Amino acid sequence: MNVKESEPAQADLQASWMCAECGYIYDPAEGNLETNIRPGMPFDKLPDDWSCPVCNHPKNQFTKFISQL
């Protein structure tokens, strides 16, 4: 039997964005209903004046990371 190692399924990988100031995580799949950001909104499509809903740090202070579910 020949078993090939496979990379994690794309559905298992998710790009999220973390605030450098407070650690808040913006998950595009969840959006942020408190700030009227609908689920499915990619980070790069957020308004330029969007800021962290926890500490008000600007959007350009978020860093991208990929987590494996």
From Swiss-Prot:
Q: Where is the Rubredoxin-like domain?
A: 14-69
A GO molecular-function annotation: electron transfer activity
Its needed co-factors are: Fe(3+)
UniProt cross-references to CDD domains, sorted A to Z: rubredoxin
Q: How is the cofactor bound?
A: Binds 1 Fe(3+) ion per subunit.
Give the residues the record marks as binding Fe cation. Answer: 19, 22, 52, 55
Q: Which Pfam families match?
A: Rubredoxin
Keyword Ribosomal protein attributed: no
Q: Biological process GO terms, please?
A: alkane catabolic process
Q: Which InterPro entries match?
A: Rubredoxin-like_dom, Rubredoxin_dom, Rubredoxin_ET
Report the family membership. Answer: Belongs to the rubredoxin family.
Q: How does it assemble?
A: Monomer.
Report the protein name in the record: Rubredoxin-1
